[in-house]
Amino acid sequence: PENAYRNGTMYSSYTAASFARKYDLAKAYDINLAGAVTWGFEFEDQQWYAGFRDMATNGVDKPVLNVFRMFGMMEFNRLKVEGDFDYDYKKISDASVRDNPDVNALASRGENAVTVMVFNYHDRNAIEVKPTPVTLNLEAIPSNKVLVSQYRVDEQFSNSYTAYKAMGSPKNPTLEQIDQLEQAGQLELFTSPQYMQVKDGKLTLNLDLPRQGVALFKVEFMP
């Protein structure tokens, strides 16, 4: 379809990157941002993955919806994120993302956990490029032991569109295929959660994030 990018990871990574910058804009202009919504619709009795601006197709969740599930897991006392970044909100608003990819993060803390969303977005939907190595250094963790879970939205994880294309893009999926698509459309763990030791309140997490990928780390404080 003409707007096939809305079916896959370009739309989901763009959503992560753009929503993160809304908070930067609000801070820059001293605005109390109480919430944000996405411009999405519901289209009934349409072809599968027709490229509409929606969160699901014929009841099957698309990757973009899993990014909103990630946002829903973030308890919002926002944490400061520092790093060697190629873009800020002003550069993106002036020139968009044309050169290096926009690799950045949004972090928050709740009573018993820290969550960090990492995204790797580019205006050119070239998903075949090499993943970007990312190192997260967390500080001031109030526990000596944590449980770390990583969720992922990319070409292989939490992506019903990839599953649909692997089926041959059927115009009328069977009930069995629909069941497979529904399962593929759920938010997936990248690996099994693991316990990690914290030293002097610090923890380092490493990942290789594919182009147009989004990762969410949930770091739960253990007693």
Question: Which residues are covered by each model-predicted region?
Answer:
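Aromatic/acidic polysaccharide-binding cleft in carbohydrate-active enzymes
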Residues: 1-113, 117-129
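C-terminal beta-sandwich/jelly-roll accessory domains of carbohydrate-active enzymes
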Residues: 117-223
